[in-house]
A protein has these predicted regions:
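Periplasmic alpha-helical coiled-coil/stalk elements that build and connect Gram-negative outer-membrane
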Residues: 1-112, 221, 225, 245-248, ...
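Short histidine
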Residues: 256-268, 299-305
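Small/polar, glycine/serine/threonine/aspartate-rich low-complexity segments that form flexible
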Residues: 90-109, 115, 138, 151-191, ...
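Sec/SRP-type N-terminal targeting helices
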Residues: 3, 26, 50, 54, ...
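Long amphipathic alpha-helical coiled-coil segments
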Residues: 82, 86-87, 287-297, 330-332
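A contiguous, mid-protein "functional segment" used to position or interact
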Residues: 271-311
Length: 337
């Protein structure tokens, strides 16, 4: 599950960076056309050098972003190769990457049920540690009671070289052991095991609370980045329209060149914001998937022991229903003696 989330994060990071390069190149092309027009007007004496240098500065600044983004793209590709167990280099699966980011279906989570938390391996591990430590109390308490052992032996002896047995001996009987004089040590051991149980219970609670926090944080990010998508999309379209109007009014002499440069900057900024928010929304969904232990749909938790392993173990030993029992979420501590 963690590996799947890591692969998804790197993959969509790669696709986002590809789109950022595309946005930068498109905006650089727009700014280059403005620079060419401004340079021609400057040579004809119709524009000042200030307008020319401003157009050149904006164009070159945007163009300089492309190598940086291309470097990030290669790093993401190499990271993805490493996760997939490959040497750094081309990843054939990335050759046919679709251009737009996918649309994520609406995620609805009304609460965080306990069964959802129990999907997480850290929470399940903490729960099993509680169960294991709870059993240690019973083991320690068993020393309060006497232990009965059945002993027996059978022997033969012979005084001849042929080895024919002449004397046969059989002995059998019970043995009783009771550490009655170690009562204080036994009591303190029970207390020690109970204290350790309480410690594992607190660790389990902390694991569950941390898991619930991570799920809630990721869910909030999913909701809020989703709410931003429509306004940012409209803002980017408005920026495109604003640039078209600015270019038209500038050519007709109603606006100065600064307004055109401003419109170009706004278009680049809004296009980047829309893309980065879409990417953040996908990342939030991946984080939610990971925080919820593999999804948020209420489905049965995987078996404690895989079927094949369980069958092998049951063939060796009579386990009863222990290997099929659900994972305990809490344990009864009992009273320490």
């Amino acid at each position: 599950m963690l590996l799947s989330a890591q692969v998804a994060t790197l993959y969509y990071g790669y696709r986002t960076t590809l789109l950022r390069i595309d946005i930068a190149q498109k905006n650089a092309a727009i700014q280059k056309r403005s620079l060419d027009i401004t340079e021609r007007l400057f040579l004809e004496g119709e524009e000042s050098e200030l307008d020319l240098q401003q157009a050149k500065s904006q164009y070159l600044g945007t163009l300089a972003l492309v190598p940086e983004l291309e470097s990030d793209l290669v790093k993401l590709r190499n990271a993805l190769s490493a996760v997939l167990g490959r040497m750094p280099g081309d990843v054939p699966e990335l050759a046919s990457v679709p251009a737009p980011l996918p649309t994520v279906q609406q995620v609805v989570i009304t609460d965080v049920p306990a069964k959802l938390l129990m999907r997480r391996r850290d929470v399940r591990t903490a729960a099993w540690q509680v169960a294991a430590q709870s059993a240690q109390i019973g083991i320690a308490q068993a020393d309060y009671f006497p232990a009965i052992t059945l002993l027996g032996s059978i022997g033969w002896s012979s005084n001849t070289i042929s080895g024919t047995p002449e004397v046969r001996s059989i002995a059998a009987g019970p043995a009783l052991t009771w550490n009655i004089l170690d009562y204080g040590r036994i009591r303190n051991n029970v207390r020690l095991q109970d204290a350790r149980l309480q410690q594992t219970i607190e660790l389990f609670r902390n694991s569950a609370l941390l898991a619930a926090q991570e799920i809630d944080d990721a869910a909030i990010s999913v909701v809020k980045t989703g709410e931003q998508q429509a306004p940012l999309h409209d803002a980017a379209r408005a920026a495109e329209r604003s640039l078209d109007l600015a270019n038209t009014l500038y050519r007709e002499g109603y606006l100065d060149f600064d307004r055109v440069l401003d419109a170009q900057r706004v278009l680049f900024t809004q296009a980047e914001r829309e893309l980065l928010n879409d990417s953040a929304h996908i990342s939030a969904v991946i984080t939610l998937y990971k925080a919820a232990g593999g999804g948020w749909v209420d489905m049965p938790v995987d078996a404690v022991v895989p079927d094949a392993t369980r069958e092998t173990m049951e063939a060796r030993t009579k386990w009863g229903d222990l290997l099929r029992a659900p994972l305990p979420a809490t344990a009864d501590t009992g009273d320490a003696k």
